[in-house]
UniProtKB/Swiss-Prot annotation:
UniProt key word Aminoacyl-tRNA synthetase: no
UniProt entry tagged with the keyword Lyase: yes
Entry GO CC: cytoplasm
Residues the entry annotates as binding Zn(2+): E183, H246, H263
Enzyme class: lyase
Gene: aroB
Name this polypeptide is given: 3-dehydroquinate synthase
Binding site for NAD(+): 70-75, 104-108, 128-129, 141, 150
Task performed by this protein: Catalyzes the conversion of 3-deoxy-D-arabino-heptulosonate 7-phosphate (DAHP) to dehydroquinate (DHQ).
Gene Ontology biological process terms from the UniProt entry: amino acid biosynthetic process; aromatic amino acid family biosynthetic process; chorismate biosynthetic process
EC number: 4.2.3.4
Source domain of life: Bacteria
């Protein structure tokens, strides 16, 4: 097992990364009250809920559960309310802990619920997908979608502890594994060319679910995110670099309808668009773009999206949270392994990059 700490000034919390982690031993120091609400979904709960429930009950905790439907399209205010209903019906108080057992949607919703319930209760993350292990479970961003935009309602809510268990990735569908690899590739492209070389050497093993390679990929990804979050917890500056591919990707997700494409699939094509625009701006070479596309394809991810009318695409991009004073800011590549956030780009070139990476 490897342990990584996220340092946040006065606070810090551990991320435990390994296979067949023992929840009783690892969670005990981080569950402060007697009451624990496990939030999961209909896919994950039959696989792992009893394991965590029994571990917590053996510690003398009162455990209640809230099982939600599975999918991005349920990340909304109606389903958030179901968590509040469960907490209130169980009679839970301000010392309770909300434990997220699932992927990014469950983590986002359970975390947001924990931030709101009685103005904030304890939160624990047990991410069961690769995407949530390397991205959404680290750094405290929580929230839900609104019909007019993704993640428009939310809060920063740091967990007490994160348990990333590689054994849980064995039950992950191929598509979900690939979606997680998109975020792993993102860390390499935005800040670590050595990691990109490592991914190029080991991608076949990652796709084949080699537990040791996955643990290394999760550790290196989380270490990158932890460093950035430590410097910029509330996304005032550097943390926005973690959105490489996301402004384009969110537009794809929003147009196609949440859940049609997985978040990681949309981010993968978004990173291709960002690389394409970076090349058009003269920052990276054609070879760099080809290298970006190749590693994304080797992870079984899309490098182009269906045709989306340009006005619609740009409309969704305008809703992005990185818009400042009416100006769209994009995360682009100065070179592979070095991203920048910038508003200095030619909109016509951006349109070309979008259109060049759509298929009929």
């Amino acid at each position: 097992m490897q342990t990584l700490h996220v340092e946040l000034g006065e606070r810090r919390y551990p991320i435990f990364i390994g296979s067949q982690l023992d929840p009783k031993q690892l969670l005990e120091p981080y569950i402060h009250g007697q009451q624990v609400m496990i939030v999961s979904n209909v896919t994950v709960a039959p696989l792992y809920l009893s394991h965590y429930q029994e571990a917590l009950e053996s510690l003398g905790k009162t455990v209640a559960t809230c099982i939600l439907p599975d999918g991005e399209k349920y990340k909304d205010i109606q389903h958030l309310n179901l968590i509040f209903d469960a907490l209130l019906e169980a009679g839970f108080n301000r010392d309770c802990t909300v434990l997220a057992l699932g992927g990014g949607v469950i983590g986002d919703m359970a975390g947001f619920a924990s931030a709101c319930f009685q103005r904030g209760v304890y939160f624990v993350q047990v991410p069961t997908t690769l995407l949530s292990q390397v991205d959404s479970s680290v750094g405290g961003k929580t929230g839900i979608n609104h019909p007019l935009g993704k993640n428009m309602l939310g809060a920063f809510q740091q967990p007490q502890v994160v348990l990333a268990d590689m054994a849980q990735l064995n039950t992950l569908p191929e598509r979900e594994l690939s979606a997680g690899l998109a975020e792993v590739i993102k860390y390499a492209l935005l800040g670590d060319e050595d990691f990109l070389v490592w991914l190029e050497e080991n991608m076949d093993g990652l796709v084949a679910r080699d537990a040791d390679l996955l643990a290394e990929a999760v550790y290196r990804s989380c270490a990158h995110k932890a460093r950035i979050v430590a410097n910029d917890e509330k996304e005032q500056g550097e943390r926005a670099l973690l959105n490489l591919g996301h402004t384009f990707g969110h537009a794809i997700e929003s147009y196609l309808g949440y859940g049609t494409w997985l978040h990681g699939e949309a981010v993968a094509t978004g990173m291709v668009m960002a690389a394409d625009l970076s090349q058009r701006l003269g920052w990276i070479s054609n070879e760099d773009v080809a290298r970006t596309k190749k590693i994304i394809q080797r992870a079984n991810l899309p490098i182009s999206c269906p045709q989306i009318p340009l006005d619609d695409f740009l409309g969704y991009m305008a809703h992005d949270k990185k818009v400042l004073n009416g100006q769209l800011r994009l995360v682009l590549l100065k070179q592979l392994g070095q991203a920048v956030i910038t508003k200095d780009f030619d909109v016509e070139l951006m349109k070309q990059a979008i259109l060049a990476n759509q298929h009929g």
